[in-house]
Amino acid sequence: MAKKIRVTETALRDAHQSLIATRMTTEEMLPVLDKLDKIGYYSLECWGGATYDSCLRFLNEDPWDRLRTIREHCPNTKLQMLFRGQNMLGYRHYADDCVEYLVQRSIANGIDIIRIFDALNDIKNLKTAIKAANKEGGHAQVAISYTTGPVFTDEYYVEYAKRIADAGADSICIKDMAALLTPTRTESLVKAIKAAVPELPLQLHTHYTSGLASMCLLKGVEAGADGLDTAISPLALGTSHAPTESMVAALSGTEFDTGLDLKQFSDIRAYFMTLREKYIKSGLLDPKMLATDANALIYQVPGGMLSNLLSQLKQAGKEDKLDEVLAEVPRVRKDSGYPPLVTPTSQIVGTQAVFNVITGKRYSMCTNEFKGLVAGEYGTTPMPIDPEFQKKIIGDKKIIKGRPADQLEPELDKLRGEIEQWIEQPEDVLSYAQFPKVALDFFEKRRNAKVGINGDKLDKKNMVHPV
């Protein structure tokens, strides 16, 4: 029986997060938004993930203004965001009142679909966000963080899918952020999950890093998947996703037709091609990110993590150490209970791998985040961590066994009080909650711009500014 396959376009979020460390500006998006809205996509993934942090930290943009702008220009297409469960859009666990408020404000400002995931596939870390999305009338799509390792059988993922369904999800996504899926594994996994929870639509998300993405998507559709994540061709391949146009063409005229017209992509493709050329010329897009690297199947490193690792090593003048760091990543992952590599665990494991290589002595220097991961502060790892390794890393520190957020008191009112002088919109407290220093810097720049102050010329000590 024929069924229309849903296509989610990632150009406005994950594609540029994977290729250029999330540096696409709202101004660069504006000329193409109206055209994207006319294509007929199931959804546009345009917000969440690292975009929030990047807007505030690097682009001097208000992420909420970006969301409202995209909503205004795309009234006919569902807008989608990536949400890290109890980690929200930040890198630690937040109290339930913060999680609920971020979900509420996201939907109020235009988000339709919230793709919620937990880096450890710990359902305890997802329930608050799922309930909040249900309450606000949003679509809660819960993502399974796909990875490989001794415990990660089809049965493991089926059991997790059942828990996701029981928690109130509206759909499920297989999120293969590290491009570890193979075509045959995709087929078996999709069949197993669809058989276990046939009532929930199943979306497929994979990256092109290892060169297998298009084959995986095709096998997944044939096995029963209902939707695909793709990227417009100039922002596809490499550490990004399968090209949208190629998948539309591959499924055209089959029982899995997407209903999209290939001719409609011409203007959009041309526009993003000019952006791609600009990014390459400026050095923002490293051509290495566009290459196929089958070693991803060995190193288990997601696209966004790979581009950020390369960026970090360049800044440290240690670019030649990339292969050593990539080889160290799976070893650190094994030591820390086989966490799937997705934010924030990808950053935690990646940074620890960098430290291990650069210092020349493994674990002689550990980040607080890595210690927290080993101590259970992010949830229960898929595999138990060796008690001797735990003692080596955290000493006699107490290990958290339950839901980490249960240790947290409500935060919102306290946070509002701390930034009362800076608040210009309800959402500002969420920026401050997730990125305190970055948000304060942004608030100050915003205030200065409104009163005509150039922060570079302001003498803060004497509170003097030249006219």
Regions found by a protein language model. Name each.
Residues F152-I164, S210-D226:
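Catalytic cores of alpha/beta
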Residues V7, A15, L36, I116, ...:
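Conserved, mostly hydrophobic/aromatic
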Residues I116-A119, D176, A223-S240:
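Glycine-rich phosphate-binding active-site loops on the catalytic face of alpha/beta enzymes
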Residues L67-P75, K127-G137, E187-P198, V248, ...:
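Surface-exposed amphipathic alpha-helices with a cationic face
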Residues A236-T258:
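C-terminal helical cap(s) of enzyme catalytic domains, especially alpha/beta-barrels
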Residues M1-I20, L67, E72:
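N-terminal amphipathic alpha-helix/helix-capping segment at the start of soluble metabolic enzymes
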Residues G48-A165, I172, A178-T182:
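Active-site beta->alpha loop and helix N-cap motifs at the rims of alpha/beta catalytic domains
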Residues K35-C55, D286-A296, Q300-V467:
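Terminal or standalone catalytic/regulatory effector modules within metabolic enzymes
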